[in-house]
A protein has these predicted regions:
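Extended basic (Lys/Arg/His-rich) segments that typically form rRNA-contacting surfaces
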Residues: 1-243
Length: 243
């Protein structure tokens, strides 16, 4: 499987070679830096860890800072963190060497299992891993809508607007029976927080690949607002019929 981290830039329309106008979403897919390659012998499974987009170093959490220092483009680097087992000058030397290690601040990190490309820590990959005509799945977070009622959140029809409705136009109505079963059934559609949830859109066709700018033009819409981060991976379910 091949995958990348990217950012949604916006939507537009392009014309295909046969003159069809197609709605596409522009995704900045890279460059992705290979941070770590996990193996069965060392980690228990095969995976490739990719990083995308820069960040101010002072905004890095201590955990991410330590991870980036330990995996800064070196496959077999074993961090010698200054622990209690090392005393005196040796411990101080370890501390100075650890603090002096340069890091590249990275905002987004994600693992891809069963990565089909032969890459090593320190390598950089981009949109050219895909080709026009490939089908991909795009994972992103839907736009947050805040607390919403059942009409907007679940597309309820609402109550009558007249004939003595008494203000029930957008209310949910009954949420269950009485003493039997005596509780609200699990999964009942009710008002609540809408959006800001992970969503996957499958089998989107790549219309164009602009490798120089690391841009993918994907047919249709993808989750999230402009500027949101997304994951683009090789489609798991190949479309049965394509036009």
């Amino acid at each position: 499987m091949v995958g990348l981290l990217g950012k949604k830039l916006g939507q537009t329309r392009v014309y295909t070679e046969d003159g069809r106008s197609v709605s596409v979403t522009i995704v900045q897919a890279g460059p992705n830096q290979v941070l770590q390659r996990k193996t069965v012998g060392k980690d228990g499974y095969e995976a490739v860890q990719l990083g995308f987009d820069g960040q101010k170093e002072q905004r890095l959490s201590l955990a991410k800072r330590g991870h980036l220092k330990a995996h800064n483009g070196e496959e077999n680097y074993t961090p010698r963190s200054p622990g209690r087992t090392v005393k005196g000058k040796a411990r101080l030397a370890n501390r100075k060497a650890w603090d002096a290690r340069a890091i590249t601040p990275i905002r987004r990190i994600k693992e891809f299992r069963d990565f089909s490309l032969d890459v090593n820590p320190g390598d950089s990959i981009g949109a050219d891993v895909f080709e026009a005509g490939d089908y991909v799945d795009v994972i992103g977070k839907s736009k947050g809508r805040g607390f919403q009622g059942v009409v907007k959140r679940w597309n309820f029809g609402g109550g009558s607007g007249s004939h003595g409705s008494g203000g029930w136009r957008r209310r949910p109505g009954s949420i269950g029976a009485g003493s039997t079963p005596g509780h609200v059934i699990k999964g009942k559609h009710m008002p609540g927080h809408m959006g800001q949830a992970s969503r996957t859109v499958q089998n989107l066709e790549i219309i164009q690949v602009q490798a120089d700018d690391n841009l993918l033009l994907v047919k249709g819409a993808i989750p999230g607002a402009n500027g949101d981060y997304v994951v683009i991976r090789e489609s798991k379910k190949k479309p049965k019929k394509t036009k």
